[in-house]
Amino acid sequence: MPGRFREDFIDALRSKIGEKSMGVYGVDYPATTDFPTAMAGIYDAGTHVEQTAANCPQSKLVLGGFSQGAAVMGFVTAAAIPDGAPLDAPRPMPPEVADHVAAVTLFGMPSVAFMHSIGAPPIVIGPLYAEKTIQLCAPGDPVCSSGGNWAAHNGYADDGMVEQAAVFAAGRLG
């Protein structure tokens, strides 16, 4: 999640989890509309989630992303490599990793139509993550809906959805 938006979500979640400890990891990849660059993010995020689950088995993870970051997390939580994905696409995470993920918060996740327009396969959240996932799409956001309002796509830090996602994630953390 970029800049202020990311910090706003972290602050909102931190304010809701009380004395629980919280670490943050920024996925490493070049965020562009060139889909193959997202592969680096899918590899990095999947590897980090798997390693954290293995090395810190009592930890509960909250995954999140905005726009292309939401697409990255969508692919990370997929149950299968989607049709049309590059041959070197990362494999899905082992099913037992899902036990370590408490919540997935996706803002402005690209729609099937948007993914098609950039030559990328559709995003399908895997069944082990579906009930743990909140997908938030601002009205008129052209990335996640059929709208044409780019201000909506760039306004998630100001429209109350960050708070909504933080409440959801905190509730899933228990």
UniProtKB/Swiss-Prot annotation:
GO terms for biological process: lipid catabolic process. GO terms for molecular function: carboxylesterase activity; lipase activity. The keyword Zinc does not apply. Does not exhibit cutinase activity. The lineage of its organism: Bacteria, Bacillati, Actinomycetota, Actinomycetes, Mycobacteriales. Its EC number is 3.1.1.-. This is Probable carboxylesterase Culp5. Pfam families: Cutinase. Disulfide bonds join C137-C144. The record marks Q68 as: Transition state stabilizer. Belongs to the cutinase family. Keywords: Disulfide bond, Hydrolase, Serine esterase. The gene is cut1. It comes from the Bacteria. The active site is at S67, D141, H153. SUPFAM superfamilies: alpha/beta-Hydrolases.
